């Protein structure tokens, strides 16, 4: 502690030589004072720290009263002095408990004040002249005051202190000596506080080392805890503040004799203070902070462990410089390796280093520095290597701290901790780093390289787990997590060559989790990843069956947000997979769940929603932390395009078939929206983006012009934006063109059936460049499904149209049924009156879009769950997926059936 | 409508209808229908029923009837003309009753008859006249005759009267939703139907049995006329009428919805205002100040149902729709039965070929 004062003196000495004297005195005094206080306060420092504020309050209170007393004294107002003394005694009585609890002795300024009053009263008492000169009131007050004082000092057993003080009184020149005293006090306690923050247990460690140092009689040791606690910039600034406080007071002292110069000095002193702010301080600290052992002493296990404990005790403290902390640990590791203290210690220290590295940034939401991440990765890697290399070290969370065996060579080393959790945390940090990197910069690619290292590390961890799984050191959950991490690093990657192996690996990993995991969450996630992986690799049937078997669509609403995001991603990927396989309806169903919401990006966690006003900063932060790193993104534009193409293929024939129906049922709202938008435009130019391409193609198809439609869908621009993104682009393109031909034929027949009485199949085949057999099959199917009222005439190869107009009664009946429907709707509304737009949604709810938007309005901030499937639309959608199986069974026959 | 009406519960359980009355009604309505008068005037054929009440058998005997004079179309909007007609009508009715009396026919009015297609013509006016008649004599009923059914070879006569609850509401002419709800009135229990027994004279009965035994007429029994599906037109008409009723229902339901919402809002408002006022008054009492009366709150106007007759229209529309639906149902089911029979017959005659041309009605989607 004295170090500070010396240093301060140094820095002050150059400001003004005239101050030196005062300074010196003060320093001496405070040092002395501190010493005896220290002695008294020794054993229970920490408790005092807790209630410091209270103590200060009491001090202030006392000082205020003393000040009043002094005023009264100088005014010779004995009456006021008497009451003042009473209140002082009372206040002191009250605060005594506080002092006692904090082990503060009777404050010196209090004693001084008592002595002063006593002296004054005695003087008055003795001085007959002065006494007679007193006013009547004052004269009355004097005897009781004197008696009270005497009695009080006697009662409180303050005689010793008073006599002590008399022997060694404060200088008379002080104007406000008690202030200074208090400051000394404050400083002492403050420096104590610095010395011993943190939890009591750490406290104990420090005091332990303290006592140790006493025993050892080693000067180095004794300075250790202090240097530890004070090597921080924080403490420096704090000391700095203290010093300023001192300096200011010095002016006050000075001001007595030299008021004119005062201002100048202030500036000068302040300047000086600022000058020597850091420059002077930091180097001193650094020098002292390095961990070192006494060269004379042999470094044994015990010493090392003690040292480690000591260093670790600084962990997590506000005042600890984290970088320094890591460096200290590193040093320890070096020493321990040097002295060959055994693996146990090494592993323990390494593990401490890893956790220290993780703690380098204070906030959990902040991401790690990339460099730190790499070092951490390496550290973990080497530790893992070490652990794999030997089976004598057991690192497990199941051990308690007391069970640790760090030194005993003959037994296995047992250390508390989990390397797997470290790996997991590292993985999380990587995700955070990638989330926070600019995804369009080279920087991102640089950082992405770490992903590979991470993968190999996880692989290594898995190897380690499989190696040591029998020894029972792993928690089941931990093991699951390791497998899960591997899955999560693999599921979205497309592997072209030796696909079989990769698929097997995925199966293996997922099966591990299916068997190991007790809680459902990981199993669900693994299942979704599995489905995703299968979908990416074009294993449509397996992927779909797995998803349907998992019943995820039924439970996903009740699962956590991350799983929901994964589910959304999986659904989209599955939809794309179905599209590649030509299962247009399935693809449409899969994609519409996400695409119809108009917030696909948000639902896939690839962008944060723009509606800030609905979200608090907190929520926004959470949302941000959930974002999927860029390299895992699903191409939303591609998805939208695929969705629109699917919609086109399904919707256009549908539109043609119910052109005259009063109520059109829309399959896809967003597709209709796009169509309507383009119809609204007064001038339709050539299509620019993919969306416009599809819309233009749809219009062409509606007119039955399949060639134009095809040109819009398959061209250079679309190749670049859409088709080249498929790994089997040519097959997909072929499939789409073929579907366009078929659907155009259907649309053509439906739209123009009224114009024809008969059509030759050959002509149709020529028109749509399909084989006659295909045309035949398509037409037959339409006839069977009662879409087209016509018959095929085999001998002439003609399609004969039948014109059936509904009879009047039928029309009327249809009208009536419509009316009844509205009646039913209105009726429902009576049962459940609702204001606003929300109303009975029964008949409309096969279409999710409408409800979705309503849902948004109702619970905009409901997180991913509410957003994705608002309102009552979900049941309908759920049904869709469920029924998909049935449709699917029909589906494979489609190309062959006719 | 008089306000002070004592409503006595009717004690009649069934109706004994003289065949004479049936014949007279059929003749009256059919002739008018043929002449197309009802289409011109837009009014239903109507007449007065006379007879007597047998309280000990709780039976109403209707023994005679006579048609009332039709309103002649009023050329100018002469306010006096309508009144004159009314007087004239009244006068003729009294005159007829007097003649009945002199001829020793039952001259006590026991109700009235009206013809309505499909038996569904319950309008506000009809309810009003039913109330008038029932107020006059508690046992009075209305006979609704369906000329369409007659055309199809069946006789449809149904006797109705207003239920006590409906009568109660009609006496106040207040069909507010709350009251209707409190009375537990639905379209099903608004009207009460009474079973009708048609009584022919013995001479008649003898003639009938002789006719049925006579050989010359018996071939008629098996004529193909029974297979006639010529109900398409009437079905169309009934569907059309149903649509009109459903439209009506829709309208009233919408206004009812609006009313419920408004009412709820109003109730809430009044409640909160009252509570506030009560609190204020309590504090005023505590202070010794005079209390503020609640009059202004009570004066806040409650929302009104936006239909003319409260829920009455809705009830009537429901009732009519029900009747129409019944009609359609019976006709279609009959037709389907006929078709099956026809098919079977046809198969017997021309083996092998099924003729589906008859199935025009069934081919609804």
Swiss-Prot record, chain A:
Ranges of biased composition (kind: Basic residues): 888-898
Compartment list: Cytoplasm
Gene3D superfamilies: 1.25.40.570
Gene Ontology CC: eukaryotic 43S preinitiation complex; eukaryotic 48S preinitiation complex; eukaryotic translation initiation factor 3 complex
Biased composition (Acidic residues): 11-23, 170-187, 209-218
Family note: Belongs to the eIF-3 subunit C family.
Functional description taken from the UniProt entry: Component of the eukaryotic translation initiation factor 3 (eIF-3) complex, which is involved in protein synthesis of a specialized repertoire of mRNAs and, together with other initiation factors, stimulates binding of mRNA and methionyl-tRNAi to the 40S ribosome. The eIF-3 complex specifically targets and initiates translation of a subset of mRNAs involved in cell proliferation.
Protein name (database record): Eukaryotic translation initiation factor 3 subunit C
UniProt source species: Caenorhabditis elegans
Gene giving rise to this polypeptide: eif-3.C
From Swiss-Prot, chain B:
Domain MPN, residue spans: 15-166
SMART domains (UniProt xref): JAB_MPN
GO terms classed as biological process: formation of cytoplasmic translation initiation complex; translational initiation
An annotated Gene Ontology molecular function: translation initiation factor activity
Superkingdom assignment: Eukaryota
Keyword entries, A-Z: Cytoplasm, Initiation factor, Protein biosynthesis
Compartment(s) where it occurs, according to its Swiss-Prot or TrEMBL record: Cytoplasm
Family matches, as InterPro entries: eIF3h, eIF3h_C, JAMM/MPN+_dom, JAMM_MPN+_peptidase_M67A, MPN
Keyword Transcription regulation found: no
Family in the record: Belongs to the eIF-3 subunit H family.
Function, as annotated: Component of the eukaryotic translation initiation factor 3 (eIF-3) complex, which is involved in protein synthesis of a specialized repertoire of mRNAs and, together with other initiation factors, stimulates binding of mRNA and methionyl-tRNAi to the 40S ribosome. The eIF-3 complex specifically targets and initiates translation of a subset of mRNAs involved in cell proliferation.
Protein name: Eukaryotic translation initiation factor 3 subunit H
Lineage, opening ranks: Eukaryota, Metazoa, Ecdysozoa, Nematoda, Chromadorea
Chain's gene name: eif-3.H
